[in-house]
Amino acid sequence: MTTIETLKWDGKKSGEVKLDLTVAKETSSADLIHRAVLRQLANKRQGTASTLTRSEVRGGGRKPYKQKGTGRARQGSIRTPLRPGGGIIFGPKPRSYNLDMNRKERRLALRTALMSRISDVKAVEDFGSTLKQPKTSDIINGLTRLGIQKTEKVLVILDSPSEVIKKSINNIEKVKLIAADQLNVFDILNANKLVIGQSAINKIKEVYAS
């Protein structure tokens, strides 16, 4: 059972919250997380890159020069890959880069990644509670009160963030907001600090406990 110190939005300590998630064995955790990240990045690829082979390039019915008598190597088409304007040999074609990983492994990888970052977690009882209207500077000042540097990449995890909070965070380059039930391994590992709302911790327990 891991205990996380909770803070108020003004940076003062308010108590503790417990988070206990089942993780992968130490011997297999690195491989599991690696495969989960590879899958996530691969599945983001569009796979729409496409080139033309010699048979697909427009033209090419004409021989560039006669078969014999020139002293040069014979060529049958002006669209051979050996000539400018010719086709591409083994070029990319549209394809799917999607990788499979079963749901049980995906959940285990996510829990393992999250628990491995527990020392970088800031649990906040009332994130953005003073915000009445979208204001980027209030979020930046609030993160500073929580002990987070402006140069650090921050992942903010909330249960059901308001539109005011969404708009306030949207304009901050190094801060990303994500819902507690939409976590992913890459964002968890990519951030320097994780700021989690107390209600989001309860949501994480509910959604990812098993």
Swiss-Prot record:
Spans through the membrane: none
SUPFAM superfamilies named in the record: Ribosomal protein L4
Cellular component GO terms, alphabetical: ribonucleoprotein complex; ribosome
Protein's name in the database: Large ribosomal subunit protein uL4
Record-stated family: Belongs to the universal ribosomal protein uL4 family.
Stretches for region Disordered: 46-89
Alphabetically ordered keywords of this record: Ribonucleoprotein, Ribosomal protein, RNA-binding, rRNA-binding
Basic residues bias: start-end ranges: 60-71
InterPro entries reported in the protein's UniProt record: Ribosomal_uL4, Ribosomal_uL4-like, Ribosomal_uL4_dom_sf
Keyword Ribosomal protein: yes
Organism: Prochlorococcus marinus (strain MIT 9312)
Oligomeric and partner information: Part of the 50S ribosomal subunit.
Gene3D superfamilies reported for this sequence: 3.40.1370.10
Protein's GO biological process: translation
PANTHER family (UniProt xref): 50S RIBOSOMAL PROTEIN L4 (PTHR10746), LARGE RIBOSOMAL SUBUNIT PROTEIN UL4C (PTHR10746:SF17)
GO molecular function list: rRNA binding; structural constituent of ribosome
